Amino acid sequence: MSEPTETVWFAWVPSHQGALAHAALKGAGRLHQAVQPLNDENRVGFPLTQVLSDSERGTLANDGVHVHAIDQRTVQRRAAVDPHQRLAQAMNEWFEHHLGRSASEVERPHKWERLGELVLVPEGSFTGHGWDDVRQHDRAEALWADMAEALGGRSLAVQAPIADDDFRSPQLTLLHGSSRVEFTAHGIAYRFDAARVMWSSGNVTERRRIGQLDLSGETVVDAYAGVGYYTLPMLVHGGATHVHACEWNPASVEGLRTSAALNGVDGRLTVHHGDNAETMAGLTGQADRVHLGLLPSSESAWQAAVRCLRDSGGWLHVHMNVEEERIEGWVERTVDQLNGLSAKNGRPFRFTAQHLERVKWFAPRVRHVVLDARARPPPDAIRH
């Protein structure tokens, strides 16, 4: 004897009564919201959450509502709105079909990052109990594809620590699709290879702040341009007249140039490919503003930054990781150090701290901060 087929019960009403019936069923808690309604000529069928008794079906029939059971394999289920639910559903379907067991036995990612159509899950994902036979399965890539789709992407990769190389290259394990990404963030288009370019989504508030500065008429030097985290906001939103972007990772240079062209600002950008200790030397006296966005410290470029400023002075945006209780002292020491570098290099500036931005927690008790330091020449050096 064959096993009974599981069914879903549908309540059928004339189409013109659909809105009223939908509201009534939903209000009574009878509407099965994980299943799509059905349409049949002049009728609409609403899925029900439970089996109705003969007497209940008879009562509904007297009101013109006819209830029929339909094989659940033929109905269409709604895609879950919550991405966590969509991910769990995709995993369960693959596990049950290919392994004959539930995905509840394994730990699934609870957070992820999306760069365009690439979904990045944290380091260590898919390594715990129950994942060995999944990774070795000849249909594993179908699971990775389903998971990427469930999270709104088309590619899936696992993050890894930043490589210990000169370029601080990202490391990731690509499970499905391509590592090349294109996306728009805060009105700026980016395109680069995420396997070769570091991207920090956590600095979004600082990128927005820098983009909100009025840079019209200014020439800016970005000492650590990367793929354009700050260069592009300064050009697109800040309206900088020109940005000199210093970067030595070839993949970042490629991504920066491509992204600048996408945003139509490549005509106001000069990319200096190479070590900024050398490239910034060629920009002496040209900048109204220098951005120093390297963590954990940008100190190695401070002297070159002071030299880049025009004789009329300007601004330095100094990034640093600092222990919370030492921030005030760090600001004072940094200003003193910048003034010392000015004197040492024959630049008659007087630096003052104008603003300190606490960007985010980098580690317990350690903050990523940005000091906005203003450089002014002494009064007797100003030409009227």
What is each of the regions a protein language model found here?
Residues 1-384:
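SAM-dependent transferase fold signal centered on methyltransferase-like domains
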